[in-house]
């Protein structure tokens, strides 16, 4: 046996131990405590982001705001009534894997579709609101998204109420595009 081989195992063990020591010396940060700004990369306390209306205090960059959080920020507390909750799109052109993808997003986001519509009060005044949520297929517009927004605007018109739409979208859903284009009223 060579003298080199005699100490090989010791070198490997010492490398593993030194790597573990470096990991152990890093401070543990509880999950969800910090948010990273996508614009400047700064780590900001999550509560500060929320209190600052989702604007980075370092660079002024914007954080994404989920639909129900946006409604909570705008509508008077306890006054929001959601409309058409059960209106969801389908898979009219039998796009492979689309139903599974939608179901996974529904479970992950707690949303049934990419837009939340309803009525609430802003400073005591009734208002109709539609809020898109980019977490759900980039808030792309499928049949149900268009229908929910249309119904909200029509109802607001009937009730003579103002409408606020927070729109953000990745475009039209290719999985439903043929169906939308072939609709008789399109």
What residue ranges belong to the model's regions?
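Intrinsically disordered, low-complexity segments enriched in small/flexible residues
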Residues: 1-111, 122
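Conserved P-loop NTPase/AAA+ ATPase motor core
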Residues: 98-117, 136-138, 160-161
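Glycine-rich anion/phosphate-binding loops
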Residues: 108-114, 139-154
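A structural preference for short, pocket-lining loop segments at secondary-structure junctions
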Residues: 120-132, 148-173
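Short acidic, glycine/serine/threonine-rich loops at helix termini
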Residues: 141, 175-177
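Conserved small/polar residues in nucleotide/adenosyl-binding loops
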Residues: 178-182
